[in-house]
């Protein structure tokens, strides 16, 4: 969905010219350790059922027989997409494992317990949900091998007089 009506004014000597700035895409970008994109993609496919929609490879290899390393990969998960990228391709950036990065994703599910179990089977570490998080509707939490925290929430069904079956 594009963002509209963001206006910028430019002059070229003849007077102001109005242009509209439109954003066509917004994606999360998750940085992982050098040459770990393939491992991350495998984990996210296994743990969460992510679907890879595209990737780019390192342009150079040491040997022709060597498998190329994945530089970045776009994954689709629960109607959203995010890019997993090799941190070595972006000087000055750090990975989610870096201290204080605080990268967290929230996934809505009908069965948080099963989601936690599947993520742990794929290599994540279970993290206890705090009392405050439970009050927010969070039912499970894991940290993946790449330092990202994943919170699982179960959607609550609120029954009111308006939507109550008779």
Swiss-Prot record:
InterPro entries in the cross-refs: At5g48480-like_C (IPR054575), At5g48480-like_N (IPR054576), Glyas_Bleomycin-R_OHBP_Dase (IPR029068)
Pfam assignment, any one: At5g48480-like_C
UniProt key word Acetylation: yes
Residues annotated with N-acetylalanine modification: 2
Keyword Transmembrane helix: no
Recorded superkingdom: Eukaryota
Keywords: Acetylation
GO cellular component terms, semicolon-separated: cytosol
Residues spanning the membrane: none
Subunit structure: Homodimer.
Protein name: Uncharacterized protein At5g48480
Species assigned in the record: Arabidopsis thaliana
